Amino acid sequence: MPIISKYTDDQVEKILAEVGAVLTKHKASPELSLMIAGNIATNVLNQNVAASQRKGIAEKFAEALISSLEDKKSH
């Protein structure tokens, strides 16, 4: 079953393009890009989510990330 998002593909793609442009501008390696993405996720959780919910949300985020990689393999 597909996941339905409250955000449009256009919203997500615009922000992703801007973030990608910043990483390209700074010639960020894949390792640095992933480190930055991880730090952003950590900061969002720590600053915007109750401590009691952080671990559960982080686990769901990790599951979604892994799932998105597995989906790519089948194409």
From Swiss-Prot:
SUPFAM superfamilies xref list: YejL-like
Superkingdom of origin: Bacteria
Membrane spanning residue stretches: none
HAMAP family associated with the record: UPF0352 (MF_00816)
Family per record: Belongs to the UPF0352 family.
The protein's name: UPF0352 protein VS_0950
Gene source species: Vibrio atlanticus (strain LGP32)
Taxonomic lineage from the root: Bacteria, Pseudomonadati, Pseudomonadota, Gammaproteobacteria, Vibrionales
